[in-house]
């Protein structure tokens, strides 16, 4: 656990409390598009030691919607100015956890898709299509396995 170097102001504390980890705007945007296109999924379902934002368990597909700041996109461009040691440790640990979760799921045969928040906002249709393409690939593999058994 990382300890803050300086006391947190009441305003900062309130700002941090207002940030949600579930049902974020980017998750809702992607989920709406998937639902609109007929994809049915589970939300925040525990799978192994992970909790993907979206999962299609029938085809072992796990989707993570990673906020750009919290998960380290372009982190080393120097956006953080205050309390740098705290944020460096926090963001680095988030990135390590993302990597560990991806490896864990892949080792168990899951397809893991990760989308940056900016990627979802920019082109949610393309993000949804990548998920649908993964589902369709898994469907073909299942059909092939079934026909080989006959």
Where are these regions (language model features)?
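Nucleic-acid endo/exonuclease domains
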Residues: 1-114, 118-150
């Amino acid at each position: 656990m990382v300890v803050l170097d300086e006391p947190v102001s009441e305003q900062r504390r309130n700002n941090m409390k207002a940030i949600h980890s579930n049902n974020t705007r980017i998750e809702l945007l992607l989920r709406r598009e998937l639902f609109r296109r007929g994809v049915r999924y589970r939300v925040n379902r525990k799978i192994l030691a992970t909790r993907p934002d979206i999962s299609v368990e029938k085809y072992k597909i796990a989707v993570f919607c990673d906020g750009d700041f919290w998960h380290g996109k372009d982190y080393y461009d120097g956006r953080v100015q205050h309390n740098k040691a705290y944020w460096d440790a926090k963001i680095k640990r988030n990135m390590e956890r993302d990597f560990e979760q991806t490896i864990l799921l892949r080792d168990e045969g899951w397809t893991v898709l990760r989308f940056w928040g900016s990627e979802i906002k920019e082109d949610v249709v393309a993000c949804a299509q990548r998920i649908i393409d993964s589902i369709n690939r898994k469907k073909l593999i299942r059909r092939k396995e079934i026909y080989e058994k006959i």
